[in-house]
Amino acid sequence: MENIEIHMLVCKKDLSMGLNCIKSLFKNKEFDQVPVFFHEDGSLDAGDIELLKKTINNSFVIEKKYADEIIRSYLSKYPFCEKYRFGKKSDIYLWHKIKTFDYFLLSKTKRVLGLDSDLLFVNKPEEVIHLVQENIPFYFPDVQSAYSFNEPKNEIPVLENVNTGLIFIPGEEYYNIESIENALSNLIRDEINYFPSWIEQSAFAHMFYMDGRYKSLNKSKNRIPFFQEVDIKKSECLHFVSYPDVRKLYNSYVSKMNFKENSKKIYEKTIEVEYDFKKIPLEIETYEDDLFLNFEFKWCIESVGINALSHQFKIKTPEEETVYEFGSNKYGFFIIKKPVDKIEIYHTYEWYGKKDWRKIEFL
């Protein structure tokens, strides 16, 4: 990983997520010596900055006040770039603006692996390692083309389904600020945009298109939970995008990564869930380690000819009641702390608000 730099934007709210992301990547020896540059958005205090430096070896924090001064000089010849980064609403969606310019322009080696703080590397990222070693630029695959161009939308050509939560820019010839300027000439025309948080991603989708060398990571191994089925044994990287139902799953995946591999199975059962005169098999397995219970399921809707049907689990302990929503995901899991007393488990399908909670007999 010669001359690679990792760049990540961090804010106070997502500080722990950023640390989890880097730790999950650094479990792989290929990355554990790569320098990390944290770009702060002005929300971190001295204690936060010290925590980053102390927790992550070979890390540096680029403070906003320093970055603003340097980046302003870079963008002085590009009016749309300058307006986007420093305009009247410069503090709105600031994190996206920092990603657009600061990662690359403040890089020392110009070989940038850009990470969002809400990523988790759940297994060794073999594809990322290979592409970085081969100097091939890439981006994370999205479930849609989340862009926000103004009319006429087709005046700016783009690659489809670009997600910039994980990108690799291998060198100076792969970052073209003229392409970003061109995209922004549409995106912030008359200082109007209907979805400002997508501007940065839209601009990069155009830059990647104009470059012609950027490659999408394998969408079967790089997933967005809730919106996509996740096989945690086969997935390499997960992106917990800023959507409530996605973020609800985040802590379960962090716990899953910390769940001991030598855990033992304590429960296994298949029940039938009645829906629309059909009986849907629901397979459940439960594992335990010293501190946690791991519930894994298979929602066999396709076996009865159903393509999509949301479902939920509810866990009741003497201390709390928690609902886990899984959309139409056929495979999944959730992890809870082992309760001192009894535990009750319920399951239901969900169809346009209609539910039918049924208790599952448990140990």
Question: Model regions: which residues?
Answer:
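Short, compositionally biased P/S/T/A/G/V-rich stretches that sit at domain boundaries
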Residues: K269-D290, K298-C300
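Short, aromatic- and glycine-rich surface loops/edge beta-strands on solvent-exposed regions
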Residues: D341-W351
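Edge beta-strands of extracellular beta-sandwich domains
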Residues: Y324-E325, G353-L363
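N-terminal anchoring/stem segment of glycosyltransferases
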Residues: M1-K77, V241-D276
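Conserved catalytic core of nucleotide-sugar-dependent glycosyltransferases
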Residues: P125-L187
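Catalytic core and acceptor-binding pocket of nucleotide-sugar-dependent glycosyltransferases
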Residues: N161-D245
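GT-A fold catalytic core of metal-dependent nucleotide-sugar glycosyltransferases
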Residues: W95-V143
